[in-house]
UniProtKB/Swiss-Prot annotation:
Gene3D superfamilies: Vaccinia Virus protein VP39 (3.40.50.150). It comes from the Bacteria. It catalyses: [protein]-L-isoaspartate + S-adenosyl-L-methionine = [protein]-L-isoaspartate alpha-methyl ester + S-adenosyl-L-homocysteine. One of its GO terms (cellular component) is cytoplasm. This is Protein-L-isoaspartate O-methyltransferase. Keywords: Cytoplasm, Methyltransferase, S-adenosyl-L-methionine, Transferase. The keyword Cell membrane does not apply. The active site is at 59. GO terms for biological process: methylation; protein modification process; protein repair. One of its GO terms (molecular function) is protein-L-isoaspartate (D-aspartate) O-methyltransferase activity. Pfam families: PCMT. It is an enzyme of class 2 (transferase).
Length: 208
């Protein structure tokens, strides 16, 4: 049953224009039902965002795939994720690169995600409980940064933790949000609007 739902999701993502076979394989391999509350497991393979507690959500599979594709990852990419959340996006990334650095401001989510990722034998991930607005300076510069919550404005710290040619994929806005890909060229940053999106807000500070 799970296998067929995974195949249906794969077919849907292809219809939506996701064509990167490595990303599609990563999504097929991961049991999305493990990343959502048990009561919502029957909805895990639908293209919906689902609540995971603490006012946070797991993004819809299309958005996970699209944002991952926009990062243009190589296996050796130095990668930062802001907002570990359920750990699902983190797990997809971990299937594609040698190592993922992920920051989460809500301690309980960070702990649960860390435990689940290890249960799934994904050991190439470093998680940190901290304010995502600050990035992870000691691990920078990054080839790619992905932000899984919407910021009102682009966090400067994240821009300047990008390598030359590095890419930041981030939703921006409050009520109306746009998904942006920002590429660094020296001290200039080229911004592309990808599409309209809906994310929970990126909040500053960290929570125990």
């Amino acid at each position: 049953m799970m296998h067929s739902r995974s195949e249906l999701l794969d077919q849907f993502l292809r219809q939506q224009g996701i064509l990167n076979e490595d990303i599609l394989l990563a999504i097929r391999q991961l049991p999305r039902e493990r990343f959502v509350p048990e009561a919502l497991a029957h909805q895990a393979y639908q293209n919906n965002a689902l609540p995971i507690g603490e006012g946070q959500t797991i993004s819809q599979p299309y958005i996970v795939a699209k944002m991952t594709e926009l990062l243009e990852l190589q296996y050796d990419s130095n990668l930062l994720e802001i907002g570990t959340g359920s750990g699902y996006q983190t797990a997809v990334l971990a299937k594609l690169v040698g190592h993922v650095h992920s920051v989460e401001r809500i301690k309980s989510l960070q702990w649960n995600a860390k435990r689940l990722l290890k249960l799934l034998d994904l050991y190439n991930i470093s998680t940190k409980h901290a304010d995502g607005w600050n990035g992870w300076p000691s691990k920078s510069p990054f080839d790619a940064i992905i932000v899984t919550a919407a910021a009102e404005s682009i966090p400067n710290d994240l821009l300047y933790q990008l390598k030359e040619g590095g890419r930041l994929v981030i939703p921006i806005g409050t009520e109306s949000q746009q998904l942006l890909r920002i590429t660094r060229h020296g001290d200039e940053f080229h911004s592309e609007v990808i599409e309209e999106v809906r994310f929970v807000p990126l909040v500053s500070g960290d929570l125990a």
